[in-house]
Each structure stands twice: as C-alpha cells, then as structure tokens.
A protein has these predicted regions:
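N-terminal Rossmann-like NAD(P) cofactor-binding subdomain of oxidoreductases
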Residues: 2-183, 188-190, 208-209, 277-281, ...
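Electropositive phosphate-/nucleotide-binding environments in soluble metabolic enzymes
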Residues: 14, 77, 111, 138-139, ...
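Predominant activation on well-ordered alpha-helical scaffold segments within soluble catalytic domains
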Residues: 21, 142-149, 196-200, 300-307
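Generic secondary-structure signature for well-ordered alpha-helical cores
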Residues: 26-29, 150-153, 193, 201-208, ...
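Short, solvent-exposed beta-strand edge segments and adjacent coil->beta transition regions
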Residues: 128, 185, 226-230, 284-286
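Short Gly/Pro-enriched turn/cap motifs at secondary-structure boundaries
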Residues: 187-191, 219-220, 264-268
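C-terminal substrate-binding/catalytic lobe of Rossmann-fold NAD(P)-dependent dehydrogenases
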Residues: 192-258
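C-terminal active-site/capping subdomain that shapes the small-molecule cofactor and substrate pocket
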Residues: 232-325
Length: 325
C-alpha cells in the first residue's frame, strides 16, 4: 500500500486506547487522524499518556472524524454497539472493535464482523471490513487449544489463568487498588467468565463436535500486565507428537511460538507474542500459554489485524522486545 493508512481512535483515554496509540505513533505506515475522548476533550494526549511526551502532539477531540480509513473502538463493553448505532461512520471506513460487543456470531446491524484471531483465520481478516478483536483470556486460552481442535481431538479442558490488574480496565475498583492487589492473589468468576462463550465458539469452528466442557478458573495477580494460562486435557498424543502438531500448526504464525523449555511471563510482557510450552504427565497433556493482555490480548492484536486488512507487513509496528530483567 503506497500512502499511509489514516486511523482514528475512539476511547483514547483508557488502557487499550493508550496502548493502541503508543503502537500507532511508531507505526511506519500510519497517520493518526484523531484521538477521541469525551472525558479528556481539548487536553493534550501527552498530558494523560505521559510516556508520549515528545512523541505525540495530538489533542483529544470530543467527536470522531469521517475521513479515517480505519477506526479503533477502544470503548467499554456494551459501548461500541451504542457508538456505532449513532455515529454515522461511513461503511467504507473499516472498524476494529476491542470490546466484546461483536465477538459472538449474532446479528450486528449493517456491519458484519470477523473474529480477529490471525492464527485461526488470517485470510478472512485480510478480506474483512470489520474486526471483532478477541478477548485477552480468550486469546491466551484459544492459542493453547486450537491445534488439538484442528485435529478433532480436543476433549474436556481444565484451565487456570492469572492476569494482571490492567485487565480490569483503568477505572478504579476495589480489586485493582494497589493496597488490595499487592502481595495478594484471588480467584474470580469461577467457571462463569464471560470469555467462555467466545472460546467455545472459536473451538467449535474447528471441531464442530466439541461439547464445550471448559472448566476455567481465572485469578487476579499482583502485577500490572500479562496473562499466564495452564490448560490440562486428556490426550493420546505422545509429547513429541504434540510438539509436532503445535509446531506445524503455528509454523506460519508471526507472533505465536512453541517453546520446548518452560516459559514465563516476563518473556512476553511488552510484546505481541504468545508463547506455548507443553508437558505430558501420564495421559494428561498440559499446555502453558503466556501473553501480554494489553498487546496480544488487545491493542497489539488489533494493530496486527489492521496490518492484515490493509495488506501491510503483519509485524509492522509490532517488533517489540521484552524486558526480562
């Protein structure tokens, strides 16, 4: 693509809005047309996102513009549908929605949304006009299970996952307050997490007979960003066979990598990577996956999807390095 992609961000004051902006400021083929935030309208973007001082001279607008090629919706769950219903954005403008509003296959008005998990449907994303960006836990769990579902051998899943405080959003809550979160661990939404519907839908797209038995216990961690998931399934595969399956499935994936050594969270934080490690104990296969919830779990994957939609290098603006010390 010759000219730069003109992008807009709606909901630019929150965590995902700020993270999307940080990526786009450094993207070689992007021009930022506007950053909208009703709560911060008229203020300098760098006054709120202070790490962008010297890198971004934009101000927050209170409205969106109509001349963008693509708009990132970084709004709260339930707000994207309301925004699109009243915004009169031209259908020629592509939409990448980071909320959960359009992830499930159900009627969504004038726009049809494609589920934006590149490892699952890269070619569909390339042709899409509207993307429903996957959830952070959904991304991390799905990337550990897709290879098994692709062979129709995925059975009952028991999974636990721990997430950083940014997964709860920027609005202060009791369970994201530093004095509560630090030196503390707690479970929440046991077996009822909202991403389960999304995960089941995705797995059934590869394995229609999957019965949807996923027993998921999410945990709050005493750190700011990152997700670490361990999923346990019964499997007849030997460990070498499992590694062959996962390595083959992800051989063309730009950001998902299979590691034969144990992974940890620091390897992925501040990157768009998902790392996968496998273990076999008896007849149980254990799949460990790790991502940064704000990047591969949100803004990084959104930019990855934008790159695919506009025929750009899939890794443009996303060649990020973890700080492991």
């Amino acid at each position: 693509m010759g000219s730069k992609v003109k992008v807009g961000i709606v909901g630019g004051a929150g965590y995902t809005g700020g993270e999307t902006l940080r990526l786009l400021v450094n993207h070689p083929q992007v021009e930022i047309a506007f950053v909208q935030s009703r709560s911060q309208a008229g203020k300098n973007v760098s006054d709120l996102h202070r790490d962008l001082l010297g890198d971004c001279d934009l101000t927050f607008s209170d409205t969106h513009q109509h001349d963008a090629d693509v708009v990132f919706l970084c709004l709260g769950h339930g707000e994207s549908k309301v925004f699109l219903a009243g915004a009169n954005i031209p259908l020629s403008t592509k939409i990448i929605d980071l909320s959960q509003d359009f992830r499930l296959s159900e009627p969504s008005g004038e726009r049809d949304f494609v589920y934006g998990l590149p490892e699952l449907q890269r070619e569909k994303i390339k042709q899409a006009d509207n993307i429903a960006n996957p959830g952070c836990f959904a991304t991390t769990i799905e990337l550990g299970l897709l290879p098994l579902a692709s062979k129709g051998i995925l059975g009952e899943v028991h999974t636990t996952g721990i997430t950083g405080s940014t997964g709860a959003g920027q609005k202060l809550q009791e369970t994201s307050h530093f004095s509560w979160r630090t030196n503390n661990v707690s479970a929440y939404k046991t077996l009822t997490h909202q991403h389960l519907k999304e995960i089941n839908q995705t797995l059934k797209s590869l394995q229609p007979n999957f019965i949807g038995s996923i027993y998921f216990v999410p945990w709050r961690g005493a750190f700011s960003r990152g997700i670490y998931v361990s999923s346990v399934v019964k499997s007849p595969l030997l460990l070498d066979e499992a590694y062959d399956l996962f390595t083959s499935f992800y051989q063309n994936a730009a950001f998902t990598h299979v590691s034969e050594t144990m992974i940890d969270l620091k390897q992925v934080v501040n990157t768009n990577k998902c790392l996968v490690h496998l273990e076999k104990v008896g007849d149980h296969l254990i799949i460990h996956t790790a991502t940064d919830n704000l990047l591969k779990g949100a803004s990084g994957q959104a930019v990855q999807n934008m790159n695919l939609m506009f025929g750009l290098d899939e890794t443009a603006g996303l060649k990020l390095k973890a700080n492991i010390h």
